[in-house]
Amino acid sequence: EETIFDFGTLKHRFREIAFLTKGLKIVARDKREEEEKEVTFHYEGGIKEFVQYLNKSNTALYDDILYFEGNKDGVMVEVAMQHNDAYTENTYGFVNNINTPEGGTHIVGFRNALTKTFNDYARKNKLLKDSEPNLSGDDIREGLTAIVSVKIRQNRSLETVKQEGLLTAW
């Protein structure tokens, strides 16, 4: 049985990897057809550029893409996010550059931290009265595009990291 690679699928994955690995340059060439195809992926801005790319068909609600990074016990976390005029949330999680479409503790932790931070800020700055309920996570994440990228040292299993709670509170 012969395996036939789809250049479109490969391009999508190479683009993801280049966004997730700041500064990495990937050159993809397809020489199977008479007319050779070549595409280069290189993003110095990493996941910030990923969010910009994902938001290109929407209007951003603020100019800056918010970016945070941290490292604890061999677990590196990067988050980039920006709200836009859409009504849906688009949060994408990755562990060691592998998409986690079902979510995971890194996504749950991110969403919980985002909701808590917004509500704490709103209370501290009197944007919410004491008698008013907190903003819901769904309302806060409406129109959000976010990338949550977690990188774990190879000698640590994802299960070990989950058990240590490193992906839930960073």
Give the location of each predicted region:
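GHKL/Histidine-kinase-like ATPase module
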Residues: 8, 15-17, 23, 27-163
